[in-house]
Design a protein with these regions (language model features):
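Basic/polar, cationic surfaces and motifs that engage anionic cell-wall
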Residues: 1-23, 86, 90-185
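N-terminal catalytic cores of peptidoglycan-degrading enzymes
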Residues: 1-73
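Structural preference for beta-strand elements that scaffold enzyme active sites
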Residues: 28, 76-78, 127-129
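A mature extracytoplasmic/lumenal domain signature
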Residues: 35, 61, 83-85, 132-134
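Short, low-complexity, polar/charged sequence segments that are solvent-exposed and flexible
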Residues: 48-52, 67, 76-77, 97-101, ...
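Short coil-to-beta-strand
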Residues: 71-88
Length: 185
């Protein structure tokens, strides 16, 4: 993982154009956290979202293969929220997000990005999975006993449910559907 510190933020309109350019190539979107600090952006991911919701890309070409999800890097895009250094899974419902927890601004921005991929990139909302969900499918998710367990975004607080912890993928995909209905994305 290489730290890329000289990236400039892009807005949703710019990102939409990059997504349109990748339409037909990208089949899946995987959602991560960087396991680092806010403002640390790594080039393993196509898109990074900082704590204030700003969006960063190491390159506008979303078809470049990046190493973000084991055995799932081809024809996919990796999106990471910056943060979650020292996070602990506990039982999921009581996740400790560490010293740089996922913010509401990150949850909203990632949800809008998912909506953009669904609307302009030909990637159904259902094809946007957290790294934890992908890890469950591939046998290295929580409780698997695997040394390389991945539980990125296993659970997230759902602001629509008073901050109750729910499956992270459910929260993000649900918000993406809402953004699509509201024509925000």
């Amino acid at each position: 993982m290489e730290y890329a510190n000289n990236m400039k933020p892009v807005d949703l309109d710019e990102l939409k154009q990059y997504i349109v350019n990748a339409n037909g190539y990208v089949k899946m979107v995987y959602l991560h956290w960087s396991a680092g600090r806010y403002h640390e952006i790594y080039d393993d991911y196509h898109i990074s979202v900082d704590n204030d919701g700003r969006i960063y890309l190491p390159d506008p070409d979303l078809t470049i293969k990046r190493n973000h999800t084991w055995k799932r890097n081809s024809n996919s895009v990796g999106i990471a929220v910056c943060g979650c250094l020292d996070a602990q899974p506990n039982s999921g419902y009581n996740t400790d997000f560490g010293s740089y927890p996922v913010t509401d601004a990150q949850i909203e921005a990632v949800s809008m990005i998912i909506a953009l991929f669904a609307k302009y990139g030909g990637v159904p909302v259902e094809c946007c999975l957290t790294h934890c969900e992908a890890a469950y499918h591939d046998g290295y998710g929580p409780y698997s006993g695997d040394e390389e367990t991945r539980w990125d975004l296993w659970y997230l607080p759902d602001s629509g449910m008073g901050g109750q912890m729910r499956g992270g993928g459910e929260v993000l995909r649900g918000k993406a559907r809402w953004y699509m209905q509201q024509s925000v994305a």
